[in-house]
Structure formats: C-alpha cells, structure tokens
C-alpha cells in the first residue's frame, strides 16, 4: 500500500520523524509531500524544506519526498496513485481538524481513505 503524508514541514520535527518512521513499517511506500500552507509564515523556502526533509529521511528506503506547492492533496494522491493519506493526531483539536479535512476529501473522491496515527507522547509537542 502506498500512502501520502502531506505537510508544510517547516521545519520537519521529531514528531514528523516518528510518524514517518512508524508509517514506513506499516506501508510499502510513503510519499512525504511538502506543500505550502498559506495560513502559516514559513521559516524556510520550499527548496530549503525539500533539502532538509530529504536529508532527514534518507535512511528510509521506502520513503520518498516530493515538493508540490500548488495542488490539492486529493489531486496529489491521484498523481502518485496512492491508496491513502496518513495524518498524525496529537490531541482532540487535531482530531476534529483532520476529521473535517478527511470528510471533504471523501466528498471529492470516495475511494481515497485517510488513515490517522496517534502521536507518540514523547514527541507530540516537539
């Protein structure tokens, strides 16, 4: 199964790394998609984020990194022929937010699933 893990990764955190590590053990292929979040002020340029994330994830043989700034996540899932989107959940606020996004994605394409992984408490706020 191939999954997409989208995010702004500005910067990539220990929480992201933990989730990606766990996902790499559960799924055949994980595509980390660096996207633009217009509601956040970026610390790094897209190219810098791409370099940092690619370097951080180089030890995972089944994880790839893609820089896609201007497309809906659901379209990226289709572009990479992925089976699902993975998201991390730290708390109830994250759950509510991710549920709303998952429901919208389901309306856009009923075949795409969203799979959530609960954050490891040791890295959920790092």
Question: Could you tell me what each predicted segment is?
Answer:
Residues 1-126:
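Nucleotidyltransferase catalytic core that binds NTPs
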């Amino acid at each position: 199964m191939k999954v997409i893990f989208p995010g702004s990764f500005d910067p990539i955190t220990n929480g992201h790394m933990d989730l990606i590590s766990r996902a790499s053990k559960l799924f055949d292929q994980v595509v980390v998609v660096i996207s633009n979040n217009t509601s956040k002020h970026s610390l790094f340029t897209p190219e810098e984020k791409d370099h940092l994330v690619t370097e951080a994830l180089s030890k995972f043989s089944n994880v790839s990194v893609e820089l896609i700034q201007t497309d809906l996540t659901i379209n990226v899932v289709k572009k990479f022929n992925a089976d699902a989107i993975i998201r991390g959940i730290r708390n109830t606020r994250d759950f509510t937010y991710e549920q709303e996004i998952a429901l919208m994605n389901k309306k856009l394409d009923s075949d795409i699933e969203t799979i959530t992984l609960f954050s490891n408490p040791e890295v959920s706020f790092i």
